Design a protein with these regions (language model features):
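Long amphipathic alpha-helical segments
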Residues: 1-74
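Glycine/charged-rich beta-loop-alpha catalytic/anionic-binding loops adjacent to active sites
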Residues: 4-11, 116-118, 165-171
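Small/polar-residue-rich loop-to-helix segments that shape phosphate-bearing ligand pockets
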Residues: 66-83, 136
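A short, well-structured juxtamembrane/interface segment
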Residues: 77-95, 103-109
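Glycine-rich phosphate/diphosphate-binding loops that line cofactor/substrate pockets in enzymes
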Residues: 88-98, 114, 159
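Short glycine-rich phosphate-binding loop at a beta-alpha junction
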Residues: 97-102, 119-121
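Histidine-anchored nucleotide/phosphate-binding helix
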Residues: 104-115, 183-186
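Conserved phosphate- and dinucleotide-binding cores of soluble alpha/beta proteins
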Residues: 123-262
Length: 262
């Protein structure tokens, strides 16, 4: 498939994990690097369709901000694939913790290695089935899991010692969460439950790029940095203000605009 066609397919993709989309897009952008005038519109098209996908913003910034776009795309893909955040999260969880969290690949990978923990996971039926299968395939059997629908925040947080959420994207002023994750965070705050933000490779952007995301869709909300207890990322746990100010990608002028898509 020609890289332009591959990128169009990625742009049209529905509700798919943004890290997976960025890895797929990196391959196509690396091939497209020989046509430099096509790179900017290709990146903008991706972001018009997935304007809250932190890893895609991060990838496009790496590619457009590099004198060697092909090498930058390949290096970015490798970083996304080798992201150690799940392992860092697994190592940070307190012993026998009761963890509440929306379903996400990073959280499930971490829980797969912690059979001493208990998990209250939130998601639609298909997502919950996938999560149960993923966690159960851990070498040690994984955490014990109970599944809940998105409309049950009080039940999810009952008895929980820790709430873990993964943002669409984050930056210096906070993190953009799905509506259901934001509802959980609000209920958890009222109940005094500690909140950890899991922000893997590509999820934290510098202020100029994060500003482009703040017009987000009606189904997403901003979680303020002061409402976060800790951020778990590729380097392990970090104080929230420091972690969310650590977006270290270029801010190419070609991305200094606000996408209108959703």
């Amino acid at each position: 498939m020609h890289p332009i066609e591959q990128l169009r397919a990625i742009a049209r993709a529905g509700d798919i994990d943004s890290t997976f989309l960025a890895i797929e897009a990196a391959d196509a952008l690396a091939e497209l690097a020989s046509e430099p005038r096509a790179l900017v519109p290709a990146c903008r098209r991706l972001l018009e369709h997935h304007h809250l996908a932190g890893p895609l913003w991060w990838l496009c910034a790496q590619v457009l901000g590099s004198p060697d776009p092909a090498a930058a795309a390949e290096q970015a893909a490798a970083q996304l694939i080798e992201d150690p955040t799940a392992e860092e999260l697994a190592g940070c969880l307190p012993g026998a913790a009761v963890v509440a969290a929306p379903c996400s690949a990073t959280v499930c990978d971490a829980l797969a290695g912690r059979p001493d923990c208990h998990a209250h996971l939130v998601g639609e039926p298909l997502a919950l089935r996938r999560a149960l299968r993923s966690i159960g395939q851990g070498a040690a059997g994984g955490a014990e899991v109970l599944g809940y629908g998105p409309s049950q925040p009080d039940e999810v947080l009952d008895g929980a010692s820790l709430l873990i959420v993964e943002p669409a994207v984050a930056g210096p002023s906070g993190a953009i969460l799905s509506e259901s994750a934001a509802n959980l965070a609000e209920v958890g705050r009222a109940m005094g439950v500690a909140l950890w933000l899991v922000a893997g490779v590509g999820k934290v952007l510098p202020a100029p790029l994060f500003a482009n995301c703040l017009s987000g869709g009606v189904d997403h909300r901003l979680l303020a940095v002061e409402d976060i207890t800790a951020v778990i990322g590729p380097s392990g746990p970090t104080e929230p203000t420091k972690a969310l100010a650590a977006g270290d990608v270029p801010c190419p002028p070609e991305l200094a605009y606000r996408p209108t898509g959703g």
